[in-house]
A protein has these predicted regions:
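Glycine-rich flexible loops
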Residues: 1-186
Length: 186
């Protein structure tokens, strides 16, 4: 059984260190919860997984815009810090959902072009998956119990029996644009 390791006082400590800015507070909370996930080998088998948070920030002109902070390449969830969750302007990423196809090269280029900080690490190859989902906080893990279920010969049948409509099922697709679009449809 996976234990809930969230501790309200620890979370508050992270938030308090972030200062008064609400977006920075949400990012600090995301750092805290990412570390909890990363410290559990049953959730991040072989280091797999990434996390994100959607916030609002001002652009150079003072306009409030939606931003997504998503785990960057080269960072481990168990030790991640705020710079390991680079921010990207969210609206241009969401517009990509209207495309029928997108090459990996173009996807990476669009992601880099929408970074708030051009020196930030490359965002996860799963950035569009996080961007296309409507949730403020997204945790993408490779949890051992789900990997076991997914590898059963009758995986979909077993998952539907256990979870009913509470779980969306997407057939295997390589990470990237196609997976993000398919997952957003579920």
């Amino acid at each position: 059984m996976i234990k809930n390791n969230y501790n309200s006082s620890e979370a508050k400590s992270y938030i308090d260190q972030a200062g008064k800015d609400l977006a920075d507070q949400d990012l600090a909370l995301r750092v805290y919860t990412s570390r909890i996930i990363g410290q559990n080998p049953d959730l991040v088998m072989h280091g797999g997984g990434n996390t994100s948070v959607k916030v609002e920030r001002k652009d150079l002109f003072g306009n409030t815009k939606q931003v997504i902070h998503v785990k960057g390449s080269g960072w481990d969830l168990d030790t991640i810090q705020a710079p390991g969750l680079p921010g990207l302007w969210l609206d241009p990423l969401r517009e990509l959902r209207n495309l029928d196809k997108l090459s990996d090269e173009d996807m990476v280029n669009v992601q880099r072009a929408n970074l708030l900080d051009s020196s930030a690490p490359n965002p996860s190859v799963e950035t569009l998956l996080h961007a296309f989902l409507p949730h403020k906080f997204v945790d993408h893990t490779h949890a051992t119990p789900f990997l076991i279920l997914a590898n059963l010969p009758n995986a979909e049948e077993v998952c539907r029996e256990i979870f009913g409509s509470r779980l969306g099922i997407v057939p295997y697709i390589m990470p990237g644009f196609a997976l993000a679009k398919k997952a957003a449809e579920v």
